[in-house]
């Protein structure tokens, strides 16, 4: 168990110290499993950095990409070029949302909402009574929405294919997850540390103490290639590094966290930059009606946004 203060101290270390720390964790993981390990590689900037660090220490560790069909086109292209192994899920995103429901507003809340709608009376009561483990007031309306809500797409489209790959090849995974990403990730790190050797699904998170700025700084100073949809990495007005285009490139059609996006949000930018995917997402997949229901805009308004983008 890692104390909160220790985690915070480690997150404040300079990048060079974090690189040394990460390599140490990779070596421990590799040696513990006799080299039977792999990198879960998404083509995004975090796993691109980790791939670079791993290849520096152990060039033989394969980078494995799960081709879900949900990546930004440039991320998918970059991942297919740089992965050593490509795997695929059994279902498409369309089949997942038809079977389980839409991913909104966050992984944890979607899980609570699904349980509030479909579990035993006791669990339903727990999810609706208020407090830490219940549906927040802001998202109560999703409990009675005319569509299903679920956190399961990540499990079906990513975790399941990777677990099958792990079983078939008898390899243990390394991921680029960072504690900084969410309170759920923070709790995971404090409970398990970087290398979780025990438990049902052993996993290594050697970049757990990194933060977004470290990733951008690493890319900038090492000049490694990365997916084009991030644009350039520049210093913003506040002295922080930033991407000139997308700064997060998870699954293109995912609604988790859209409520925290600035303006234009991910769907408004998608309309501008990826009109074909936008039409499929909003109309064919029905994401438009979900966003309408929760009052989140998804139409791009050029003049207003372009002024805002220029001042960004």
Predicted regions and their residues:
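ATP-dependent adenylation/nucleotidyltransferase module used to activate substrates
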Residues: 2-214
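ATP/NTP-dependent adenylation/nucleotidyl-transfer catalytic domains that generate, transfer
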Residues: 2-8, 212-312
């Amino acid at each position: 168990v890692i104390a909160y203060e220790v985690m915070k101290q480690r997150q404040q270390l300079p990048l060079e110290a974090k690189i040394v720390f990460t390599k140490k964790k990779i070596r421990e993981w590799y040696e513990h499993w006799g080299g039977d390990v792999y990198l879960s590689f998404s083509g995004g900037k975090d796993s691109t950095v980790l791939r670079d660090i791993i290849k520096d220490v152990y060039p033989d560790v394969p980078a494995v990409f799960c081709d879900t069909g949900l990546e930004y086109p440039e991320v998918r292209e970059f991942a297919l070029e740089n992965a050593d192994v490509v795997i695929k899920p059994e279902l498409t995103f369309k089949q997942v949302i038809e079977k389980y429901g839409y991913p909104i507003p966050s992984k944890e809340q979607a899980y609570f909402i699904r349980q509030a709608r479909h579990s035993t009376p006791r669990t339903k009561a727990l999810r609706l009574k208020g407090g830490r483990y219940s549906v927040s007031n802001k998202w109560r309306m999703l409990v009675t929405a005319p569509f299903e809500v679920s956190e399961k797409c990540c499990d079906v489209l990513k975790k399941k294919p990777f677990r099958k790959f792990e079983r078939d090849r008898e390899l243990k995974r390394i991921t680029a997850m960072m504690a900084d990403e969410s309170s759920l990730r923070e709790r995971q790190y404090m409970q398990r540390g970087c290398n979780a050797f025990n438990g049902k699904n052993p996993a290594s998170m050697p970049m757990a103490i990194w933060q977004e700025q470290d990733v951008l700084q690493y890319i900038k100073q090492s000049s490694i290639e990365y997916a084009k949809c991030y644009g350039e990495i520049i210093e913003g007005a506040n002295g922080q590094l930033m991407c000139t285009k997308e700064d997060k490139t998870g699954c293109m059609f995912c609604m988790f966290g859209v409520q925290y996006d600035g303006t234009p949000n991910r769907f408004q930018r998608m309309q501008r930059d990826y009109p074909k995917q936008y039409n499929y997402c909003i109309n064919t997949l029905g994401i438009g009606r979900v966003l309408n229901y929760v009052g989140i805009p998804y139409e791009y308004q050029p003049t207003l946004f372009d002024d805002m983008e220029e001042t960004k």
